[in-house]
């Protein structure tokens, strides 16, 4: 990850890392300094003789830069150490690999707390990449721009691996996402596809000089990682020529995609659902007692099939909380599935706000507020309230040059949505707290507002 800090490196111990590959630095993060602080033994050891008291299983570190860092291999030097004997050993290792063995310990983003290491197998990610590529109709003639992080399933599976299985050209616009760099790559490389989370597409569409880029070669891609606002999807299709843009839904624990829209789905379906279930995957919607609901009824979405992870690494308790004895992955998402099999994600089970006994779904309010011409992005969540149990709060990023107030928001909502769904509190911000993969962290927004407003959590029986 490009946003790592020393406290996050507990992963080295958690998953018993034996070899670590690192860049020298990225933006404000100096990885070499972090590692030398954590592993002082590096200063006095040979690269192949690392013995770290805090990380006893770590055998060696490889750094990709040009510096000769004490105790570490340079990537190029390490590559040159390989000989014919090593190649022969690799062939032997390859013959002993099995499809159900772990290939990736993928840490979840942690929108609600400490990340967990999802154990993904060869079967999990290779097949998921294959079906995603087929949904996008990727071929050897396509050129896919991948500005999303490669340390996340979005970049690794839906980007790199999907290109490998289809023979598609990969285009990387930069070390990290930059809207201008991405637009320039799309234009110069005549890309036919591009991936991104909603905030990335929003950033590109709002770039100064957006109209100067020729994006007519584009046709497809995936927008995923967070709920896609309807108005944003319409702009992506009309202004970026992505008429075959797909929406994908899933989670790290399901390798990641379980639902995806087709390139020829009606635009109405693509802006209002996450598509239909992927091949060889099952889905169901259940109520709080676990009863399977009828078509169109709302409840928690469960998925099952080849794509479900083996479990959280060395964490059977949290694995059992997420995957039941019948193999169903409990997604934590509220959803409906219609008679044609299209799934609509209503929100997170934990994000649902209960105001005065009324169930309020933040995404519904977010979709409505995004129709306001002065609002660029919005996140809605609940905060404690002595009278109603919870009240509605909205964090808003305004369009450039616009000012938004609580009165503006309330008057815009008045008569258009139910009174109990109208935000009681509004905070105008320039950005949201996000995970490194671009997902808004509502729990941090909730904590900030609770503290700023001096609210107290209401105790319930």
Regions from the language model: what does each represent?
Residues 54-58, 63-69, 73-107, 114, ...:
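Conserved pre-ATP/AMP-binding loop-to-beta segment of ANL
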Residues 85-88, 99, 104, 118-139, ...:
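Conserved structural elements of the adenylate-forming
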């Amino acid at each position: 990850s490009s946003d790592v800090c020393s406290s996050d490196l507990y992963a080295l111990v958690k998953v018993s890392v034996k070899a670590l590959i690192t860049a020298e630095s990225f933006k404000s993060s100096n990885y070499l300094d972090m590692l030398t602080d954590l592993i002082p033994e590096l200063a006095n050891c040979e690269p192949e003789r690392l013995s770290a008291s805090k990380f006893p299983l770590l055998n060696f570190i490889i750094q990709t830069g040009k510096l000769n860092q004490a105790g570490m291999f340079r990537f190029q030097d390490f590559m040159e150490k390989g000989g014919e004997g090593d190649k022969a050993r690799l062939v032997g290792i390859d013959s002993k690999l099995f499809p159900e063995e772990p290939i990736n310990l993928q840490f979840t983003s942690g929108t609600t707390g400490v990340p967990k290491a999802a154990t993904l197998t060869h079967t999990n990610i290779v097949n998921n990449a294959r079906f995603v590529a087929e949904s996008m109709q990727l071929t050897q003639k396509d050129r896919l721009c991948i500005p999303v992080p490669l340390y996340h399933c979005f970049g690794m599976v839906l980007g790199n691996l999907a290109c490998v299985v289809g023979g598609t050209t990969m285009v990387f616009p930069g070390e990290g996402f930059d809207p201008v760099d991405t637009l320039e790559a799309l234009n110069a490389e005549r890309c036919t596809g591009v991936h991104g989370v909603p905030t990335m597409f929003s950033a590109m569409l709002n770039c100064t000089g957006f109209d100067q880029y020729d994006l007519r070669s584009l046709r497809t891609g995936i927008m995923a990682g967070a709920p896609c606002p309807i108005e944003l999807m319409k702009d992506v299709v009309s202004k970026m020529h992505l008429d075959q843009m797909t929406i994908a839904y899933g989670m790290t624990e399901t390798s990641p995609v379980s639902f995806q829209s087709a390139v020829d789905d009606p635009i109405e379906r693509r802006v209002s659902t996450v598509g239909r279930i992927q091949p060889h995957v099952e889905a169901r919607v259940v109520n709080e007692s676990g009863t399977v609901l009828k078509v169109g009824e709302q409840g928690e979405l469960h998925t099952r099939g080849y794509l479900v992870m083996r479990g959280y690494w060395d964490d059977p308790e949290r694995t059992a909380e997420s995957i039941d004895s019948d193999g169903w992955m409990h997604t934590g998402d509220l959803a409906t599935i219609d008679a044609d099999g299209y799934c609509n994600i209503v929100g997170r089970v934990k994000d649902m706000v209960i105001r005065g006994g009324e169930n309020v779904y933040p995404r519904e309010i977010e979709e409505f507020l995004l129709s306001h011409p002065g609002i660029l992005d919005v996140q809605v969540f609940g905060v404690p309230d002595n009278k109603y149990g919870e009240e509605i709060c909205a964090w808003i990023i305004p369009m450039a040059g616009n000012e938004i107030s609580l009165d503006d928001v309330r008057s815009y909502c008045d008569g258009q949505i139910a009174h109990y769904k109208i935000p009681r509190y509004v905070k105008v911000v320039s950005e949201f707290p996000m995970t490194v993969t671009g997902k808004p962290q509502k729990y941090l927004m909730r904590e900030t507002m609770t503290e700023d407003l001096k609210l107290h959590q209401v105790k319930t029986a």
